[in-house]
Amino acid sequence: MKLFVLGATGYIGGDALHAIVKVHPEYDITALVRNPDKGAQVAVDYPKVKLVYGDLDSCELIVEESQKADIVCNWADADHEAAAKAIIKGLSARQSGTPGYLIHTSGTGILMYTDLDQKIFGEDATKIHDDWDNIQEMITGIPDHAPHRNVDKVVQSVRDGKAVKSAIVCPPCIYGAGRGPGNQTSVQVPLLAQNTLKQGHGIQVGAGKTFWTQIHVHDLSNLYLKLVEAAAADGGSATWNDEGYYFCESGDLVWGEVAHQVAKSAHKQGFMREDQVKEYSPEEVKKLAAWGPALWGCNSRCRAIRAKKLLGWSASSPSLKDEIDATVLFQAKKMGLVPGHAKIAAGDA
């Protein structure tokens, strides 16, 4: 079974690669990496993985490698339209007589469009999207201007399934330490922790009532593994193309509550004098983090039904709340707030 993977040194892709290689060392895997330094990171942990050098704009290379593959996993960028088109072009040109499989990564930021359109930040929402009863809403009902939607539509444009069968995995707020060869850190909660430590207090957008959904990176990787295994079994029990949309979640979070958890953890670990949380306007948050108003202030709620029903997938890793202390400590170390750590990290100790 030949796989071509994009994003192997990223947070999502690195952990997914770890999960797949651990269970299926027999797979013939080729990874796109940007440069020899990135390649060396992969080669140390996965010497059997073949490396090709380029980036997401290396469309001819992506077409060529996709044409050679049975399965392509795009873990690299939910917003790179040219790369998605190149993958589909390559898979469509395969001469094997069987369909090639594309497993693409989107993100539940796509669900923020209502709040973004109405410029509502910090308030709650009752709308919960799902990938079973309302699957067609995710295929045809999301407006074109929603985040990630342009590339979702490219992937969904392959409808007959004769040459290409596609599945979109749509993860929410991802947390937990990755196991990959490159980046092992997520964005939303670590960025909140970093700015909390910088400001000396917790950061809440507006009333702090905003809902998101959460998933541990290890549980997300398990879904990628199950989809790859299904693809390797001629599609298996998975659904593809018009029904190939998979949320991946383990429940809701409320950003105001997360802000308090981060502040309490920072105080408990001695990085802040108190555990106070301050309310910020979207404009104030934007000065700290360009996407902060959306990441911590817009609603994005979903339910992962399809993977559970069809693939037997379930989440089993620790909750986000259980990982807060480790996240805060990691960011504190990066910022040199842990005595001696900055010198060790710089090689001066």
Task: Give the role of each language-model region.
Residues 27, 317-349:
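Amphipathic terminal alpha-helices
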Residues 33-94, 106, 110:
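NAD(P)H-binding glycine-rich loop region in Rossmannoid oxidoreductase-like domains
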Residues 191-218, 223-226, 238:
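A conserved pocket-lining segment of Rossmann-fold NAD(P)-dependent short-chain dehydrogenase/reductase
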